[in-house]
């Protein structure tokens, strides 16, 4: 736990630690039962079962390390910028920048997450 951040922000930092550790059960517990997750290239994932399916079967990343470079807290929301370095399921190595936006429910669980990647698109 980091004393510089709120419990919600520490929960976001825990999220990246759990993802990097491959702790899918721990990841899912951070989300509200009806949470929605949106990221480029996929239809939104709604609910814990859909999130678990994504992390177990659909996520193109095999493993890696997230480094959070900045974290900004708002009212019931947390924004993060960071870098990811890892390996895709194909064996390809990747290194990219990302931004995540988490909406936090009154109970502390994530009600929504939106992910964006810094990649040439236009």
Where are the model-predicted features located?
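Short, low-complexity N-terminal intrinsically disordered segments enriched in polar/charged residues
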Residues: 1-29, 33
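Phosphate-binding glycine-rich loops and adjacent basic patches that engage nucleotide phosphates
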Residues: 11-20, 44-45, 61-65
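Short beta-edge strand/loop motif at the mouth of beta-sheet-based domains
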Residues: 44-53
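A beta-strand edge to alpha-helix "cap/lid" segment located at domain peripheries
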Residues: 2-7, 38, 52-122
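Conserved beta-to-alpha transition
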Residues: 40-42
């Amino acid at each position: 736990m980091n004393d510089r951040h709120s419990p919600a922000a520490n929960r976001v930092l825990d999220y990246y630690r759990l993802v990097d550790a491959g702790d899918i059960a721990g990841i899912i517990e951070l989300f509200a039962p009806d949470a929605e997750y949106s990221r480029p290239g996929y239809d939104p994932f709604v609910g814990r079962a859909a999130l678990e399916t994504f992390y177990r079967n659909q996520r193109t990343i095999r493993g890696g390390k997230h480094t959070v470079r900045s974290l900004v807290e708002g009212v019931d929301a947390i924004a993060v910028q960071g870098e990811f370095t890892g390996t895709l399921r194909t064996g390809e190595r990747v290194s990219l920048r990302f931004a995540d936006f988490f909406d936090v429910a009154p109970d502390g669980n994530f009600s929504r997450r939106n992910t964006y990647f810094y990649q040439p698109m236009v």
